[in-house]
């Protein structure tokens, strides 16, 4: 069968101008004497492709025109002859009845001049094939006999035209888009149904697993409803308090807040003194049965109020983690070391650390606690420990009191050890950015000695030449030694070095959350001790800074936090609050770890030259 040529208008984008997905035929009697008719056939596929090119440009209004002036011209243009022109008039095919002769189509060319002259008789142009076209008695829908063949042709042509366009390629699923596909909760025996927050139907992590927290999905939903109800009541009471409260400079607590404080004090008085024998047996049985796959039983360990507060914090943290997972900011199982075997401890990591890729893909990392070398398996670690001769950090021991020692390690002389120490610290610090460039720093490593060696407690790093007088660049206490007073000892030791150097020091910003809490506590203790021993009437922040080696900015911020700094009659006054001093003295008397202090007489150190 001979192939028919296409009759199309030349558009600026190089495609045939057509707004319909049917085979059209048009016979014009007024042009039969002057213009030879040319036959063309437009398939569904070519019509769809031309339609997609025309949809991007605004459609001009179809104008009526008079018969005495020719308003169109037919022209035979092939695809290879089409050239883009800056201004091309819009063309629309006219539908008419199919004649028994040949299949023909003529394209009407509306010029801008004629559309302006006939603006009073405008009509809406035909829309897309899915839209509504102007209906008339001569409109006939013609279907192609080879629909599947036409669709395959259109698909092939569209792939060729969009070969260089990446937007036409199938989009790859990201983690958060395929989060609910082929995933399950890692807790043994869990079917991934329910969520700790009570707001989701499924979960895929331990943080949102009701079974891990010894709860059921229904119990989580009931607790969520109770929390929402309490939040609504609290918001309503806050609105009432805001309406009744005047905008004063010093606002006293409201009656509702005072009642709530008394209620909390009464609830905490009901705390059980200890566990009974039956409860201890129950807890031990639960621990032996489930091990680390379930959360330990927490009932009767503290007051009901504190336990409920802890449960709320758990649910809120789980909700925040769920949002981060859905946004793709947390990808579980990809380049994340979950645990490390460090000496006799197994530590859960908090953050990602840039270990080499072959180690970062492991879920568990094995590490020598003396030389800090990291390994892939328990066998490699056992063989290494049999040959490792290190029993303490490298460098000079500059402090020793009892079993506590501090070693000064130069990052230039012991580069590998300091790099491994930084990689280890990044597992527990979020804002740490120093990993490999350790040569300009000194590292002060605190250890605790026993018959097997000196075990790492924590460390802090310090620039050799700090122009801003930073006495700490990075500080870390190992998780197994936290909440035992060692962090405050490291901070005190850094200020002890500043006193020997006769400088005023301050930690480098930004501080981590735990670091800020530790430093606030240390500054508070230093100021209260100084005010307790001070007997004069006038005090100077500069004198406090010179005696304690604490930066004046840190002193002022701590005084403001304690509400001990006031402005009165054009002067700044430091108030000596005896109630805070008495409270601090009582806490100092109750502390059992009185040996967790740094003794300046045990320091054997001189400042390095050039600092």
Curated annotation (Swiss-Prot):
Task: Report the Gene3D superfamilies cross-referenced here.
Answer: 3.40.630.30, 4.10.320.30, N-acetyl transferase-like, Winged helix-like DNA-binding domain superfamily/Winged helix DNA-binding domain
Does the record's keyword annotation contain Zinc? Answer: yes
Ranges in a coiled coil:
none
Pfam families, per database record? MOZ_SAS (PF01853), zf-C2HC (PF01530), zf-MYST (PF17772)
Q: Where are the zinc fingers (CCHHC-type)?
A: 176-219
Changing residue 57 to A: what effect? Leads to cell cycle arrest in the G1/S phase
Annotated ranges, domain MYST-type HAT: 332-607
An annotated GO cellular component: chromosome, centromeric region
Residues bound to Zn(2+) are 368, 371, 384, 388
List the biased-composition ranges (Basic and acidic residues): 110-125, 148-168
Broad enzyme group: transferase
- On whether Acyltransferase is a keyword of this UniProt record, the answer is yes
Where is this chain compositionally biased, Low complexity type?
Answer: 42-57, 134-145
Q: How is it modified after translation?
A: Phosphorylated at Ser-50 and Ser-53 by ATR in response to DNA damage, promoting its ubiquitination by the CRL4(DDB2) complex and subsequent degradation. Phosphorylation at Ser-50 and Ser-53 by ATR in response to ultraviolet-induced DNA, promotes localization to DNA damage sites. Phosphorylation at Ser-57 by PLK1 during mitosis seems important for prereplicative complex formation and DNA replication licensing, and requires prior phosphorylation at Thr-85 and Thr-88 by CDK1. Phosphorylated by MAP2K1, which accelerates its degradation.
Positions bearing Phosphoserine: 10, 50, 53, 57, 64, 102, 111, 124, 158, 162, 164, 178, 506
Reactions catalysed: L-lysyl-[histone] + acetyl-CoA = N(6)-acetyl-L-lysyl-[histone] + CoA + H(+)
Residues annotated as binding acetyl-CoA are 475-477, 483-488, 512, 521
Expressed, tissue-wise, as follows: Ubiquitously expressed, with highest levels in testis.
* Impact reported for residue 338 to R: Decreases ubiquitination
Q: What does this protein do?
A: Catalytic subunit of histone acetyltransferase HBO1 complexes, which specifically mediate acetylation of histone H3 at 'Lys-14' (H3K14ac), thereby regulating various processes, such as gene transcription, protein ubiquitination, immune regulation, stem cell pluripotent and self-renewal maintenance and embryonic development. Some complexes also catalyze acetylation of histone H4 at 'Lys-5', 'Lys-8' and 'Lys-12' (H4K5ac, H4K8ac and H4K12ac, respectively), regulating DNA replication initiation, regulating DNA replication initiation. Plays a central role in the maintenance of leukemia stem cells in acute myeloid leukemia (AML). Acts by mediating acetylation of histone H3 at 'Lys-14' (H3K14ac), thereby facilitating the processivity of RNA polymerase II to maintain the high expression of key genes, such as HOXA9 and HOXA10 that help to sustain the functional properties of leukemia stem cells.
Q: How does it assemble?
A: Component of the HBO1 complex composed of KAT7/HBO1, MEAF6, ING4 or ING5, and one scaffold subunit: complexes containing BRPF scaffold (BRPF1, BRD1/BRPF2 or BRPF3) direct KAT7/HBO1 specificity towards H3K14ac, while complexes containing JADE scaffold (JADE1, JADE2 and JADE3) mediate acetylation of histone H4. Interacts with MCM2 and ORC1. Interacts with the androgen receptor (AR); in the presence of dihydrotestosterone. Interacts with CDT1. Interacts with MAP2K1 and CUL1. Interacts with p53/TP53; leading to inhibit histone acetyltransferase activity. Interacts with MIS18BP1.
Q: What is known of its domains?
A: The C2HC MYST-type zinc finger is required for interaction with MCM2 and ORC1. The N-terminus is involved in transcriptional repression, while the C-terminus mediates AR-interaction.
The name under which this protein is listed is Histone acetyltransferase KAT7
Recorded source organism is: Homo sapiens
């Amino acid at each position: 069968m001979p192939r028919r040529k296409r009759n199309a208008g030349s558009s600026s984008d190089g495609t045939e101008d057509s707004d319909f997905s049917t085979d059209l035929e048009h016979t014009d009697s007024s042009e039969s004497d002057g213009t030879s008719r040319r036959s063309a056939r437009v398939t569904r596929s070519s019509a769809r492709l031309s339609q997609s090119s025309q949809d991007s440009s605004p459609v001009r209004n179809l104008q009526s025109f008079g018969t005495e002036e020719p308003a169109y011209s037919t022209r035979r243009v092939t695809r290879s002859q089409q050239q883009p022109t800056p201004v091309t008039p819009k063309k629309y095919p006219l539908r008419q009845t199919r004649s028994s002769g040949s299949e023909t189509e003529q394209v009407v060319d509306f010029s801008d001049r004629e559309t302006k002259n006939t603006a009073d008789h405008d009509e809406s142009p035909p829309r897309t094939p899915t839209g509504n076209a102007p209906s008339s008695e001569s409109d006939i829908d013609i279907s192609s006999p080879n629909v599947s063949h036409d669709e395959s042709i259109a698909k092939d042509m569209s792939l060729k035209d969009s070969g260089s366009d990446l937007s036409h390629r199938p989009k790859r699923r990201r983690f958060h888009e395929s989060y609910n596909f082929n995933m399950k909760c890692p807790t043994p025996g869990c079917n991934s149904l329910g969520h700790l927050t009570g707001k989701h139907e499924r979960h895929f992590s331990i943080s949102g697993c009701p079974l891990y927290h010894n709860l059921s999905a229904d119990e989580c939903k009931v607790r969520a409803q109770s929390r929402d109800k309490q939040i609504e009541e609290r918001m309503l009471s806050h609105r009432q308090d805001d309406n009744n409260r005047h905008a004063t400079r010093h606002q006293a607590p409201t009656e509702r807040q005072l009642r709530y404080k008394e209620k909390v004090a009464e609830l905490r008085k009901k705390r059980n003194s200890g566990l009974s024998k039956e409860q201890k047996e129950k807890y031990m049985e639960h621990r032996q049965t489930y091990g680390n796959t379930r959360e330990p039983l927490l009932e009767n360990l503290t007051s009901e109020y504190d336990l409920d507060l802890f449960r709320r914090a758990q649910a809120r943290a789980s909700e925040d983690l769920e949002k981060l997972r859905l946004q793709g900011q947390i990808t579980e199982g990809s380049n994340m070391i979950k645990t490390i075997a460090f000496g006799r401890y197994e530590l859960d990591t908090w953050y990602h650390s840039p270990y080499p890729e072959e180690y970062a893909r492991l879920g568990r990392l094995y590490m020598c606690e003396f030389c800090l070398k990291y390994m892939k398996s328990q066998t490699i670690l056992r063989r290494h420990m049999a040959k490792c001769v290190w029993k303490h950090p490298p460098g000079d021991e500059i402090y020793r009191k009892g079993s506590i020692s501090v070693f000064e390690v130069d990052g230039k002389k012991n580069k590998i050890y300091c790099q491994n120490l930084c990689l280890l610290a990044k597992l527990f610090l979020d804002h740490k950015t120093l990993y490999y460039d350790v040569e300009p720093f000194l590292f002060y490593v605190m250890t605790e000695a026993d018959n097997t060696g000196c075990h790492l407690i924590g460390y802090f790093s310090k620039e050799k030449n700090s122009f801003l007088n930073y006495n700490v660049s990075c500080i870390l206490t190992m998780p197994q030694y936290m909440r035992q007073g060692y962090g405050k000892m490291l901070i005190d030791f850094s200020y002890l070095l500043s006193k020997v150097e006769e400088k005023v020091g301050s930690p480098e910003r930004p501080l981590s959350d735990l670091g800020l809490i530790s430093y606030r506590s240390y500054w508070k203790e230093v100021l209260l001790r100084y005010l307790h021993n001070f007997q004069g009437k006038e005090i100077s922040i500069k004198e406090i800074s010179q005696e304690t080696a604490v930066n004046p900015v840190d002193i002022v911020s701590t005084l403001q936090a304690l509400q001990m700094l006031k402005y009165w009659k054009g002067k700044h006054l430091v108030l000596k609050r005896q109630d805070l001093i008495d409270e601090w003295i009582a806490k100092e008397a109750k502390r059992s770890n009185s040996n967790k202090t740094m003794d300046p007489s045990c320091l054997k150190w001189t400042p390095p030259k050039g600092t």
